[in-house]
Amino acid sequence: YNDGLITIFALGGIYAIGTLGFSMKEILVLGIVLNIFAALGSFIFGYIEDKIGVKRVINFSLVMLVVSTTLAFISPWTSYPKVIFWISGVLLGTMVGPNQSCSRSYMAQIIPENKKNEFFGFYAFTGKATSFLGPLMFGFLTKLYSQQIGLLSVLVFFVIGLIIFNKKLEK
């Protein structure tokens, strides 16, 4: 699911400009607001994680990232596309911080104590090694069809991540 986040970070603004007609000023304001909501989400979900556990927060954040991406996808077909995209963005921003922090926290919980450096190093390496996949898929689908169809690649990464994460929880 991290490739989906990387793609959103890299291409979300381009989607907003190209598909929804956002101005550069609107993108700048959106970026600032998203960062504020990411900080708030991290803070609030830090307390929630203490109550319900890291796995549930990750699961919830992934479901909300799917909802957010779906809203961004359908926004051009609504009566208020920019408003729907803003809602999508605020939801995404709120969930990004908890998703990333809880994912690292969960990893720290499940790996052997004496192997933490190796596992986190491998985690960083694989994240960098595959970080091109989301933007590549987005670009390929955009070239063939449209930016909206390109955005579906992000949805695919989030859904696959959600499925894999829940398969891991079953074991």
Model-predicted segments: where are they?
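Short amphipathic helix-loop junctions that connect adjacent transmembrane helices
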Residues: 10-27
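Loop-to-transmembrane helix entry/capping segments in MFS-fold secondary transporters
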Residues: 24-25, 113-123
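Helix-to-loop junctions at the C-terminal end of transmembrane segments
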Residues: 40-54, 142
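Hydrophobic core of transmembrane alpha-helices in multi-pass small-molecule transporters
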Residues: 82-98
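Intracellular juxtamembrane helix-capping segments at the cytosolic ends
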Residues: 98-111
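A membrane-interface helix-boundary motif in multi-pass transporters
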Residues: 140-158
